[in-house]
Curated annotation (Swiss-Prot):
Name of the protein: Glycine dehydrogenase (decarboxylating) 1
Gene3D superfamilies: Aspartate Aminotransferase, domain 1 (3.90.1150.10), Type I PLP-dependent aspartate aminotransferase-like (Major domain) (3.40.640.10)
EC number: 1.4.4.2
Any Pfam family: GcvP2_C
GO cellular component, one term: glycine cleavage complex
Keywords: Oxidoreductase, Pyridoxal phosphate
Species for this entry: Colwellia psychrerythraea (strain 34H / ATCC BAA-681)
Catalysed reaction, written as an equation: N(6)-[(R)-lipoyl]-L-lysyl-[glycine-cleavage complex H protein] + glycine + H(+) = N(6)-[(R)-S(8)-aminomethyldihydrolipoyl]-L-lysyl-[glycine-cleavage complex H protein] + CO2
């Protein structure tokens, strides 16, 4: 008897849906085993039990069918080829740079760096924390101030945060006026003016010299100016200080290698972009902004701050310091709504400084400056004199034949800054060569000018000429710490990067089940286009006709996201979820204002909301009213209805997350939307949990008016260890006219003249291909299956853990959505073991903790995502069950409450190399289950003392001896 051969069709053999299988973790057999445990026949039957039928979509979303990786990459490559990457001399905060290949391959393209999460669990994040401390030290050294944060979203955002800091700390309390020099980058002015409008601040934009003539609480000055001018502003700063004003300086980081630091000139805060330290322009981002200030203003500093503390062995250890300033704790009273920043890009910039060191940076900066001097001298000898005699890298010329020069430039594949009438500006950078300068002579002067770069260089050397005033030549040392003077060969640099990487736990090691964070697969194919030169090397203000590849990709992605969200229009400008919230709330405010309802300023927020919600509402000057939740964790409908009706005359909106932050599909969500609309408000549906909606329902279908999407959650952009992120917003048509625009690049004719929320017109555009490929590879079926499996995995974990821990909230049929909350409070009551103890103990099992104490104190919120296999889920469940058994030994008295594996966790190699006198074995400490022995992750420090770190704040690199293990 012969077996019948099964013949597949060609369509099946072409594997067009193969990526779905690669992305979704559980195999068919694993899925069936989980369904058996859950008591359902199929994934679809489970979904029917969980998602309310009245909000279910009838059909799959109208996006493309899935593609193979080869096909999707080839198609996107064809789109990218539509971009025309010219030699760029536009400047304005975006410069060509040479990313060292050792950093490109081993950091930007390395999942050990890009798949980690924000270092809330510092014992397993010492590598990137050390690199971020290097970043802070770099910023402190170059700016001449005392304290730095670990990055902000972009230069414009940092400038807006500087304005907010100035208002908080200025002693000129009666003033509501902020001054901006007219030589600040136009996009920065745009972002700051938008923020000021929402804060109710007045703005004056004028020549910097006029600042002291105004009664201001603060001022923003560019150094060097957007025009390239380098000016000694120390006397001006002193005058502003005499009038009790605060001065923020927006500085070019490369120029500070040669120029006197803003701190030495008297600045109170310094902001800027670290992009030109090895991070590609990427059509606007992502890039890490820096923010430094004086120690006395540390409590007002926005963003993450990395500080030095001690672990339980007294060893120096790093952590995020002073978190009580931040939105996840202070909510509406936070300094900023910034949550995720730009950690991956800050680390790239820090490694750039480490690799080149002070001498290497000086060589690069001097080369850029010398080429600018050669260009300036050459043109001057032919009668074309730069407007400013003092500059670093940017020359501005008044020209009568502007159109002719621009035409020659375009013919030579070169872009200049041309937005000022009668002027062109040319900014040189690290990529500029002597051949480029020779070409610039041809463009500016026409052929036959007879200028020779080498001859001009000889003249400059012989004359000792300097276009930097003597009073502004940097004399103070930079980057003196040994870390910036030790790793200048590629061998040493590679090993240093690897040494730091090995200290961190990321998705390349194990599941990270952080609730509300969606730590899913960031597929390698999706990451590849980020470093394609067609995407990486495009200036955000390049002529639009040169960026047709970006336009095509962004337009197609926006169309897909509109379909998946049920909205009518998308804006890609917000470069984080927090920025998306801010932009969406601005749209709501402007909409009410357009209808004569500017008095509508009350925002209802459920008690369970993420801290960014109230912090964002405060940024648009809304008043926050909290809506209660019932004992099931759902919005208390009676309380909502009463407050909406009571506040109807002034109701602006509600901010609500769906599924709820408690991990449940609330069956009343459509009714909630109706109540708000009936009382004149708008519905802001936070997109944090879109991974439980895509393909099954949508915010627009539910009845919401606006949402932001966390592309770094639902749509596969990696978290980068704390950024980058992207937070585009979708809106219904009535809100579309109020989306952000841009000062230099009109995003949409319908939004022309609107303010910006980010420095670049499309935010961090170079990471949008990740989301584009996520959707293209999965297709309509795959993106829907991803949602279904996220729900399936979460319910499997919830069911298994419910046999050992209370599950705090569930929906109908006892099911959860895509995440669940495990209640640990009874264990604390019975044993003294805290959620912190359990989080640290999970490190010994090779896992990052779930989200701790949010949205309910004393709990874990677990979100496994669709990308994890049953094998990995079972490994995590085993760890949690074993930890519960360990707690029982504390409860029974077998282990003392202050001497047990949980209290002493995490355990390090140092612990087991010393005499062992603990009541549990070494094996119980570090190899508690068999699975750990095959893939042991060793924390490099013991538990860190948070209180010591905040009481003894050190946010710069400690002595080199402290790095010795």
């Amino acid at each position: 008897m012969t077996s019948k051969t099964i013949v597949n069709s060609l369509a099946e053999l072409e594997q067009t849906q193969d990526f779905i299988r690669r992305h979704i973790g559980p195999s068919e057999s694993e899925t069936q085993a989980m369904l058996n445990d859950l008591g359902v026949e199929s994934v679809d039957a489970l979904i029917d039990e969980i998602v309310p039928s009245d909000i279910r979509l009838a059909d799959l979303p109208n996006v493309e069918e899935s593609k193979t990786e080869v096909q999707a990459l080839a198609d996107l490559k064809a789109v990218a080829s539509l971009n025309k990457v010219n030699d760029t001399y536009i400047g304005l905060g975006y410069f060509g740079t040479l990313t060292p290949n050792v950093i490109l391959r081993n950091v930007l393209e390395n999942p050990g760096w890009y798949t980690a999460y924000t270092p809330y669990q510092p014992e397993i994040a010492q590598g990137r924390l050390e690199s971020l401390l290097n970043y802070q030290q770099m910023c402190i050294d170059l700016t001449g101030l005392e304290l730095a944060s670990a990055s902000l979203l972009d230069e414009g955002t940092a400038a807006a945060e500087a304005m907010a800091l100035a208002k908080r700390v200025s002693k000129n309390k009666k003033s509501n006026l902020f001054f901006i020099s007219d030589d600040v980058y136009p996009q920065t002015i745009d972002v700051v003016k938008q923020r000021a409008e929402m804060f109710g601040f007045d703005i004056v934009v004028a020549p910097a010299a006029d600042a002291a003539e105004h009664d201001i609480f603060g001022a923003l000055i560019q150094y060097p100016g957007a025009s390239g001018q380098v000016t000694d502003v120390s006397e001006l700063i002193a005058k502003i200080h005499d009038n009790k004003g605060i001065v923020a300086v927006a500085a070019d980081i490369m120029s500070l290698v040669l120029l006197k630091s803003p701190g030495e000139l008297g600045a109170d805060a310094v902001i800027g972009s670290s992009q030109r330290f090895g991070v590609p322009m990427g059509y606007g981002g992502p890039h890490a902004a820096f923010f430094t200030t004086l120690d006395k203003y540390k409590r007002s500093l926005p963003g993450r701050i990395i500080g030095v503390s001690k672990d339980t062995r007294g060893k120096n250890a790093l952590r995020m310091a002073m978190q009580t300033r931040e939105q996840h704790i202070r909510r509406e009273k936070a300094n900023s709504n910034v949550c995720t920043a730009q950690v991956l890009l800050a680390n790239m910039a820090a490694f750039y400084a480490v690799y080149h060191g002070p001498q290497g940076l000086k060589t690069i900066a001097n080369r850029i400056h010398r080429l600018a001097d050669i260009l300036c001298l050459g043109t001057a000898t032919k009668g074309l004199t730069a407007v400013h005699a003092n500059y670093f890298d940017t020359l501005t010329f008044n020209v009568d034949n502007k159109d002719e020069i621009v035409a020659r430039a375009l013919a030579a594949n070169a872009n200049f800054r041309t937005d000022v009438d009668g002027q062109i500006s040319i900014a040189l950078d690290e990529t500029t060569t002597r051949e480029n300068v020779a070409q610039l002579f041809d463009i500016l002067l026409g052929e036959g000018h007879g200028l020779n770069v080498s001859d001009l260089d000889d003249q400059i050397v012989a004359s000792g000429h300097s276009s930097i005033p003597a009073s502004l030549v940097r004399e103070s040392a930079i980057l003196t710490h040994p870390v910036f003077n030790s790793y200048h060969s590629e061998t040493e640099m590679l090993r240093y990067i690897k040494r730091l990487e090995n200290k961190d736990l990321a998705l390349n090691h194990s599941m990270i089940s952080l609730g509300s964070c969606t730590m899913k697969l960031n597929a390698t194919a999706q990451m590849i286009p980020v470093s394609w030169p067609e995407f990486a090397n495009m200036h955000p203000f390049a002529p639009v006709n040169q960026a047709q590849g970006y336009k095509a990709m962004i337009d197609e992605l926006a169309k897909w996201l509109v379909e998946l969200t049920g909205y009518d229009k998308m804006s890609m400008q917000p470069n984080s979820g927090a920025q998306g919230e801010y932009a969406g709330l601005i749209a709501i405010s402007k909409y009410h204002e357009s209808r004569g309802d500017s008095h509508r300023n009350i925002c209802l927020i459920p008690a369970s909301a993420h801290g960014t919600n109230p912090a964002s509402a405060m940024m648009v000057d809304m008043k926050i009213v909290i809506v209660a939740c019932d004992k099931e964790g759902n919005v208390d409908m009676a309380d909502l209805k009463a407050k909406a009706e009571e506040l109807a005359d002034n109701l602006a909106c509600i901010m609500i997350t769906y599924p709820s932050t408690h991990g449940v599909y609330e069956t009343t969500i459509a009714e909630i939307c109706n109540i708000i609309h009936d009382n004149g408000g708008q519905v802001y549906l936070d997109g944090a949990n879109m991974n439980a909606q895509v393909g099954l329902t949508s915010p627009g279908f539910i009845g919401a008016d606006v949402s932001h999407l966390n592309l770094h959650k639902t749509f596969a952009i990696p978290h980068g260890g704390g950024g980058p992120g992207m937070g585009p917003i979708g809106v219904k048509s009535h809100l579309a006219p109020f989306l952000p625009d841009h000062a230099l690049i009109n995003v949409d004719e319908a939004t022309k003249g609107n303010g910006a929320v980010s420095s670049a017109p499309f935010g961090s555009a170079s990471i949008l291909p990740i989301t584009y490929l996520y959707i293209a590879l999965l297709g309509k079926k795959g993106v829907t299956d991803a949602t279904k499996y996220a729900i399936t995995n979460a319910n499997y974990v919830s069911k298994k853990l419910s046999e050992h821990y209370p599950i705090l909230y569930s929906g109908k049929n006892g099911r959860v959505a895509h995440e669940c909350i495990v209640d640990l409070r009874p264990l604390k009551a019975s044993s003294g073991v805290t959620e912190v103890d359990m989080a640290k103990r999970l490190m010994d099992y090779g896992f990052h903790s779930p989200t701790m104490s949010f949205p309910v104190a004393g709990t874990f919120m677990i979100e496994p995502t669709e990308s994890e296999s049953k094998v990995e889920l079972d490994r995590f469940i085993e760890a949690m069950v074993c930890i519960r058994d360990e707690v029982r030994k504390v409860e029974s008295g077998e282990w003392a409450s202050d001497n047990n594996p949980l209290h002493n966790a995490p355990h390090t190699l140092a612990d087991i190399t010393e005499p062992w006198d603990r009541p549990y074995s070494i094996q119980e400490a570090v190899f508690p289950v068999v699975a750990v022995t095959a893939n042991k992750f060793w924390p490099t420090v013991n538990r860190i003392d948070d209180v010591f770190g905040d009481r003894n704040l050190i946010c710069s690199c400690p002595p080199i001896e402290s790095y010795i293990d």
